[in-house]
Amino acid sequence: QRQMCIRDRVSAAISAAGVIVLLTAPPTILTGVIVALLFALGYGLDSADGQVARVTGASSPAGEWLDHVVDSMRVPTVHLATLVGFIRFPEYFSASHTTDGFPGGWILWALPMAFTVLTAGHFMSQVLAEQLRKNRKTAAPSTGGNLRSFINLHMDAGTLCWIYIFWGFGVIFVFVYALLFLANAATVLLSMRRKYVTLATPASSPSQEA
């Protein structure tokens, strides 16, 4: 358990280093590469640690709690750091390369703010739905299998990590980031609707199934 805690701290520290670089360094191609690598490494360590814990049965309530806490802060922090970058360098991320050009000002800033809200809402939706299913007799969710996993690759935190490769390309990053937001928003809305329906549907009893 102690080793798992240490690995969680290392993963969080690497992700934090990526956030610090994003906050302090100018938006160059090199900055984007460094940030993407740090984010991907931090996420990869966290994901691998979780897989090992599940396979070996070494997971514990404390470890699972810590993992969820770190995850709940990691992605929103990335979006907030992106917001700071947009505020600090509006002329770099604007299509017209001016402080008041499109998409500049509040129009540009609204994107990471909306992404932060979407991420927080989706995380709460996932965790709360899981807990409610454990405590109440509701219909089981559909799994969707490997096809759904492939279709939902844009929802994976690893995808978010790697788009920062484009951080040094200004408006191209904004375009890719906006596309990722729209794809995530559509998927989250569908996911929330599906969860609401399954939670509102009582589980079938053996007599009903017969």
Indicate residue ranges for each PLM-predicted region.
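Membrane-embedded alpha-helical segments that form the functional core of polytopic membrane enzymes
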Residues: 7-62, 79
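A feature for the membrane-embedded catalytic helix bundles of lipid/isoprenoid biosynthetic enzymes
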Residues: 69-210
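Membrane-interface alpha-helices at helix entry/exit sites of multi-pass transporters
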Residues: 61-69
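Short, small-residue-biased leader/transition segments that mark boundaries at the very start
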Residues: 2-5
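Hydrophobic core positions of alpha-helical segments in small-molecule transporters
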Residues: 10, 34, 38, 66, ...
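Short, solvent-exposed positions on alpha-helices
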Residues: 7-8, 64, 171-174
